[in-house]
């Protein structure tokens, strides 16, 4: 099932602003920072134990418990309890993406025995923010709730000075994400996803592959970051970055970089062990 728009929530702007102010000074976790190019952060509001320190997602089958930070955010808690089936909630996190940051194209839950159903509620966004799934690009608007098929290759980015904040909720797995909604304004028509990106020409591709002249261990991470962002501007599948990177390293003829790229693609798209962290 592909990502799609589910409905919309009308915010109490004053109460939301109070909780967002609390989050501005809250401590965000560095868990999953190896998935980020730039500043991507998360903090846990509900999890398996209710302990703030538990910031890695694991399989479990009980309703999530509120963390200490969650208890200091009364309006966000009210939003969860009013608009979602809390008995099916397994994790609730705030995800903040800052200026010129993106998530490396990846699939989620690869390290877990069971998967979840993931919904996003947009708390703060702007026109410089976008999400991608395979070859599609879309913008999640303020107050909107989206189902994200986290098993499909996807990415997210913020190309503005104002960070993007989403409330990200993992529920027990189901084929019907709409069943988790409560008191939500339902969409009347199907949302059209307009693709504003440029065409990916042969000239652009050769320019990308030109990194083969300079790529090295010293700049590998920076080149990965550039490649991860390109599909937000050109009509390409988010997975294309791995094809480009493999060809760049092949042209360079460096066995260590070729091996590193194979490991990178395996970790983000194929398989990763529980607790495994990618360094590159």
UniProtKB/Swiss-Prot annotation:
Stated EC number for the protein is: 1.14.11.56
Anything known on activity regulation?
Inhibited by metal ions such as Co(2+), Zn(2+), Cu(2+) or Ni(2+). Is also inhibited by EDTA or diethylpyrocarbonate (DEPC) in vitro. Unlike the procollagen-proline cis-3- and trans-4-hydroxylases from mammals, does not necessarily require L-ascorbate for activity although it does increase the activity of the enzyme.
Keyword Oxidoreductase among UniProt keywords: yes
Q: Name one GO molecular function term.
A: metal ion binding
Temperature and function: what does the record say? Optimum temperature is 25 degrees Celsius.
Q: Which reaction does it catalyse?
A: L-proline + 2-oxoglutarate + O2 = cis-4-hydroxy-L-proline + succinate + CO2
The prosthetic group or cofactor this protein requires is:
Fe(2+)
**A Pfam family this chain is assigned to:** Asp_Arg_Hydrox
**Binding annotation for Fe cation:** 106, 108, 154
Sorted keywords for this record are: Dioxygenase, Iron, Metal-binding, Oxidoreductase
UniProt cross-references to InterPro entries, sorted A to Z: Asp/Arg/Pro-Hydrxlase, IPNS-like_sf, Pro_3_hydrox_C, Pro_3_hydrox_C_sf
Binding-site residues, 2-oxoglutarate: 164
Q: What does its pH dependence look like?
A: Optimum pH is 7.0.
Textual note on the cofactor: Binds 1 Fe(2+) ion.
Q: What practical use does it have? A: Would be one of the most promising biocatalysts for production of cis-4-hydroxy-L-proline (cis-4-Hyp), a compound which was clinically evaluated as an anticancer drug.
The entry's family comment says: Belongs to the L-proline cis-4-/cis-3-hydroxylase family.
Could you tell me what this protein does?
A: Dioxygenase that catalyzes the 2-oxoglutarate-dependent selective hydroxylation of free L-proline to cis-4-hydroxy-L-proline (cis-4-Hyp).
Instruction: Give the protein's recorded name.
Output: L-proline cis-4-hydroxylase
Q: Which organism does this record belong to? A: Rhizobium meliloti (strain 1021) (Ensifer meliloti)
């Amino acid at each position: 099932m592909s990502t799609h728009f589910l409905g919309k929530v009308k915010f109490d702007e004053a109460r939301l602003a109070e909780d967002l102010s609390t989050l501005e000074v809250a401590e965000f976790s560095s868990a999953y920072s190896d998935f980020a190019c730039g500043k991507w952060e998360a903090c846990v509001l509900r999890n398996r134990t209710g302990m703030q320190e538990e910031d890695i997602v694991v399989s479990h089958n009980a309703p999530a418990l509120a963390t200490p930070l969650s208890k200091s955010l009364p309006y966000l808690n009210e939003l969860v309890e009013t608009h979602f089936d809390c008995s099916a909630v397994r994790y609730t996190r705030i995800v903040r993406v800052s200026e010129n940051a993106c998530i490396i194209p990846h699939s989620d839950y690869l390290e877990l025995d069971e998967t979840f159903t993931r919904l996003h509620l947009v708390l703060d966004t702007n026109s410089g923010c976008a999400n991608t799934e395979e070859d599609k690009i879309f913008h999640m608007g303020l107050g909107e709730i989206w189902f994200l098929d986290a098993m499909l290759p996807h990415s997210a980015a913020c190309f503005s000075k104002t960070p993007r904040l989403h409330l990200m909720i993992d529920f027990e797995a189901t084929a019907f994400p709409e069943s988790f909604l409560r008191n939500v304004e339902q969409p009347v028509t199907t949302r059209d996803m307009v693709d504003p990106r440029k065409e990916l020409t042969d000239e652009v591709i050769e320019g990308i592959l030109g990194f083969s002249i300079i790529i090295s261990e010293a700049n590998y991470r920076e080149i990965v970051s550039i490649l991860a962002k390109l599909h937000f501007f050109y009509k390409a599948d988010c997975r294309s970055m791995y094809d480009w990177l493999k060809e760049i390293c092949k042209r360079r003829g460096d066995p260590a970089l070729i091996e590193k790229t194979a490991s990178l693609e395996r970790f983000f798209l194929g398989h990763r062990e529980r607790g495994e962290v990618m360094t590159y």
